[in-house]
């Protein structure tokens, strides 16, 4: 019973503290365009405070964004493609 109560309390907290992946957008609602992953790594980590980032389909895709950051709405197929980084 105690385990169940602990599970019910911890589960919502884990969802709140989780981080998300996606194309981080600026104040104009556009994701940074790119050709090189090094540019995206710097853009994601220094501008958007993500854990890392790389160039996916000519836009910077960031990993580990805070929940309050806005991301570009994309299709599930594109998201699953970009969630698997080719270059580390």
Swiss-Prot record:
Chief place of localization: secreted
Gene Ontology CC: extracellular region
Compartments where found: Secreted
CDD domains tied to this protein: neurotoxins_LC_scorpion
LCN-type CS-alpha/beta domain boundaries: 20-83
Endpoints of the signal sequence: 1-18
A GO term, aspect molecular function: sodium channel inhibitor activity
Membrane-crossing segments per the record: none
Top-rank taxon, per record: Eukaryota
Keywords: Disulfide bond, Ion channel impairing toxin, Neurotoxin, Secreted, Signal, Toxin, Voltage-gated sodium channel impairing toxin
UniProt KW Disulfide bond keyword: yes
Domain remark in the UniProt entry: Has the structural arrangement of an alpha-helix connected to antiparallel beta-sheets by disulfide bonds (CS-alpha/beta).
Protein name: Beta-insect excitatory toxin 2
Source organism: Androctonus australis
């Amino acid at each position: 019973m105690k385990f169940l109560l602990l599970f019910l309390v911890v589960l919502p907290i884990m969802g709140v503290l989780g981080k998300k992946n996606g194309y981080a957008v600026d104040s104009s609602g556009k994701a940074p365009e790119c050709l090189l992953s090094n540019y995206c790594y710097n853009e994601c980590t220094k501008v958007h405070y993500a854990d890392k980032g790389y160039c996916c389909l000519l836009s910077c895709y960031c990993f580990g964004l805070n929940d309050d950051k806005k991301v570009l709405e994309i299709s599930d197929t594109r998201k699953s493609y970009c969630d698997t980084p080719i270059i580390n």
